[in-house]
Amino acid sequence: MAHYLVIVESPAKVKTIKKFLGSNYTVAASQGHVRDLPKSQLGIDVENDYEPKYITIRGKGEILAALRKEAKKSDKVYLATDPDREGEAISWHLAAALKLDEKKMRRITFNEITKNAVKASLKAPRDIDMDLVDAQQARRELDRMVGYKISPLLWAKVKRGLSAGRVQSVALRIVADREAEIDAFIPEEYWSLDAQLKVKGEKRPLTAKFYGTEKKKMTIHSKEEMDEILKKLENEEFQVTDIKNSERTRKAPLPFTTSTLQQEAAKALNFGTQKTMRIAQQLYEGVDIKGNGTVGVITYLRTDSTRISEEADAAARSYIAETYGEAYVAEGTKAKSADKKIQDAHEAIRPTDITRTPAAIKDSLSRDQFRLYQLIWKRFTASRMQPAKYETTAVKIGAGEYCFTVSTARIAFDGFRSVYVEAEEEKEESNVLVGHLSMDSVLTKEEFDPKQHFTQPPAHYTEASLVKTMEELGIGRPSTYAPTISLILGRRYITKEGKNLYLTEIGEVVNNIMKQSFPSIVDVHFTANMEGLLDMVEEGKVPWKEVIRNFYPDLEEAVKIAEKELEEVKIEDEVTDVICEECGRNMVIKYGPHGKFLACPGFPECRNTKPYLEKIGVTCPKCGKEIHQQTIDQIIDRLMALEEKTRVQLLAPVIRGKKGEHVKVFEDARKQGYVRVRVDGEIHDLSEEFKLA
């Protein structure tokens, strides 16, 4: 019997896919990339037409040896990495590293990890798409060139540990520009005026809002203007001058793309972008469903397409007709996108089986998995449903030369809203008293309610709104939104307070240097155009090295000028009262990928470091020890350092402080029960994920 090897990226996929295939199939994981540019050097032969110098990633030797051994025993090797540029490149690197015979090597892809999808992919194998690979190679070299050439300059001129990046630096500038807008904002005064009007025969008054004159909307700019209007209204009669009844519809939303999922999960579930992607990855790769084993319950999570397969569309319409009735099924086919940036034939993010309702598998999912799956399921189901229909009434009420308005809207047919309502959807106005009004009705004024307001500055970016802006501007791609935001947070270029993102001092310094010395790198249009060029490489329209040839010389010249002309910027470390037990110096606060830590200023002579523990003046009621404040990432780092069998409980009510959301934890936590933390009022059980129980 012939033997086949299927290589995927992650061990989680191995478990899911194994059960779909027979005993003559071996499924193994590469565990991500196996080759990359070396970390210790540029890794690009500039003198040899920018040829990349790939090496085996440290720690991947044993994995490759095992795969090589298995490949030799197999009649055919199927490379089943993710269906995008990165996945295509991993397959290409695997083929090279394993020295696979082209005759026995085939590439397969699937948008969902289900039995039907995997079986179908095996019936339609193909060659590796070198246009996709070349687009990834171009992106990798561009990113390496920017990071490798500019980051050392930041170390020399500002401080070590800083970095620049082709996408991260533009994202930082977007946040910095918004901060500048907020700082420069000058509030302007304006006033609103509500009138409480009594309808004859009714006990409760209705609230009418000042509009202006019958034909022109007015803005009231000052108290003086308001006083003048109130004086004129003093003895005026309030009479209905116009009533308009109309119908309107609200279309169902499109199914999720990566960016819209990240945005809505942030609004509805309070998930950060990284958390959303981590949980979506779990749902895609497979979860244990009682009675069904490991099942991939959503389609591929990195996509900018709203397209839905004909099979999924038909299944959804059938389910909706059976569950909600034929009247709820949308007409025609929805969700084709004309966006030229769409990288491939991916579908939107959807459940792999619409009949697998959230309620049906709730007991098989963690709380976070359930909430995200429910969001995806509802959004997809709603996208195949009829619009919601509203009956609206708008009334104009005249008072002398002025006009007030009152309106109401009633849902006539709920349509898709029977399943899904967006987190920030506007509340429909509801004023039942409007139904008691008719033309020329006279109302009695009970009181006026004038209020002073001031225009508000632009809102600070949140993770959700930053993702939305990046997508709208063409900055980055579905796979890069979350890592980019995580990176500039980790570098402390921005901080997160509540949901809002704020520019830090070090972020401002780095952004100013980038704008001064590398204006094109942080230019939104330049970066968007570069993404467009990468798309053209993927489409086979532009050779990938042509993109590099047109980029690198200008970058190298800009670096040389900056090295000569850029002045050093000194940023002092914050000194603490904690004494270094090694040398007696006062330790300083440093920032790492997961937040603050204490370091000796005597580095490199003294390399002492320790965790940064913020005292909050609260003792543990069980053991009497002091409770400290730490970030989730700091906690996870410490959990990972424990022995595998350790059982830990972290009792963690949220503290909201200047530096973001933290949790209280017991310093002596390992003596407690199991791994559990509470963030934003939500309990997270980490024991499975970190294998500590």
Question: What do the predicted segments below correspond to?
Answer:
Residues M1-Q137, Y211-E214, I220-K223, D227, ...:
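Intrinsically disordered, low-complexity regulatory segments
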Residues A2, I506, V522, L613-A693:
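Conserved phosphate-binding elements of NTP-dependent enzyme cores
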Residues A2-L5, T16, Y25, S151, ...:
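Basic, low-complexity terminal or inter-domain segments flanking catalytic cores
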Residues I113, A117-A195, N245-S246:
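C-terminal or mid-to-C-terminal helical accessory/interaction module adjacent to the motor/catalytic core
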Residues R139-I150, V167, A195-L197, R248-T260, ...:
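Core structural elements
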Residues K215-L254, S441:
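Metal- or metallocofactor-binding catalytic centers and their adjacent structured scaffolds
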Residues T260-G272, V467-R477:
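Short helix-coil junctions and helix-kink-helix linkers
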Residues M277-Q281, I485-S486, F666:
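Short, hydrophobic-biased segments on the C-terminal half of alpha helices
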